[in-house]
A protein has these predicted regions:
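Intrinsically disordered, low-complexity, positively biased terminal segments
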Residues: 1-166
Length: 166
């Protein structure tokens, strides 16, 4: 359900759940940071709430993809990216973000973060938390604080919205 503002969206949803004969309301596409989650009375407020990952992305041209998106924070981090499908993406890159824009260039400096292209794609969407990935051991940090620096730059005020399907 799309609406012009969060207040309108919540008002429409409240109207739906307040109908006398309405036993359930089902929403198929809810973003990870949708205001609806704040409206529910805790994690058990929805009887069948579960994430559905129907929006995936494949970065094809890493430098252009990273330069094409906006950023909330800034960073200067050297990342080592693995990409078995597209060798042009693989390698060591310096990611410098300032003023909401990124400059990405090949680097011979020592890597500060090591991650796969899929993890970078998830962060590119703004919902793959790099700090959580690091804590889980799926990406590596060679310089203390480098993952946090990179994630602060990649975070967005509103995460990507899952598509309704194709």
């Amino acid at each position: 359900m799309l609406a012009g503002s969060a207040a309108v969206r919540l008002a429409l949803l409240r109207r739906l759940v307040d109908f006398d004969l309405m036993a359930t309301v089902t929403l198929k596409t809810i973003g990870a940071d949708d205001v609806l989650w704040q409206w529910l009375p805790g994690p058990r407020g929805a009887s069948d709430a579960h994430p559905y990952d129907n929006l995936w992305i494949r970065l094809v041209d890493l430098p252009r993809a990273l330069a094409a998106r906006g950023y909330e924070g800034s960073c200067d981090v050297v990342v080592d990216v693995t990409d078995e499908l597209l060798p042009a993406n693989a390698g060591t890159w310096r990611v410098t973000v300032a003023g909401g824009e990124a400059v990405v260039s090949p680097s011979t400096d020592a890597a500060e973060v090591r991650l796969g292209i899929a993890h970078l794609g998830s962060a590119w969407l703004g919902w793959g938390n790099l700090s959580a990935m690091h804590r889980a051991g799926v990406i590596a940090e060679e310089r203390p604080g480098a993952v946090s620096d990179l994630w602060r730059a990649f975070r967005l005020d509103v995460a990507a919205w899952p598509s309704p399907g194709f």
